């Protein structure tokens, strides 16, 4: 197999306690789904379900059938653990209740 038939990519998956990052060569025309399987990430992180997890390349969402190119970093995204709007409301409420100057600013309407 000629080197020209191969592309160098990396596969990344982050957990709260660790990161899986592997750089390797795959054949041209390999899809994101095939690259994930080839990386071995599912043996290290068994919670990954390719049929339900969202994937992307450098922070841009892609479909699993997208073909990878040289230099791509395939990212596997975890589901959100908290609703961002609800988390912000809780932070604001906590700041308001703290009695600090910043908390008082929230109560006065930002002045």
Swiss-Prot record:
Identification of the protein by name: Protein RnfH
Chain segments carrying region Disordered: 88-111
Domain of life from the UniProt record: Bacteria
SUPFAM superfamilies xref list: MoaD/ThiS
InterPro entries in alphabetical order: Mopterin_synth/thiamin_S_b, RnfH, RnfH_sf
Family indicated by similarity: Belongs to the UPF0125 (RnfH) family.
Pfam families with a match to the protein in the record: Ub-RnfH (PF03658)
Biased composition (Basic and acidic residues): 94-105
Organism the protein comes from: Cupriavidus pinatubonensis (strain JMP 134 / LMG 1197) (Cupriavidus necator (strain JMP 134))
PANTHER family in UniProt: UPF0125 PROTEIN RATB
């Amino acid at each position: 197999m000629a080197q020209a038939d191969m592309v160098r990519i990396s596969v990344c998956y982050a957990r709260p306690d660790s990161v899986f990052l592997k750089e390797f060569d795959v054949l041209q025309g390999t899809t994101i789904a095939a690259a994930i399987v080839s990386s071995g990430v599912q043996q290290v992180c068994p919670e990954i379900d390719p049929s339900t997890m969202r994937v992307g390349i450098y922070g841009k969402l892609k479909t699993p059938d997208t073909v990878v190119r040289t230099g791509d970093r395939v990212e596997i995204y975890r589901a959100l653990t908290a609703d961002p709007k609800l988390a912000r409301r809780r932070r604001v409420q906590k700041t308001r209740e703290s009695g600090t100057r910043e908390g008082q600013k929230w109560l006065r309407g930002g002045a």
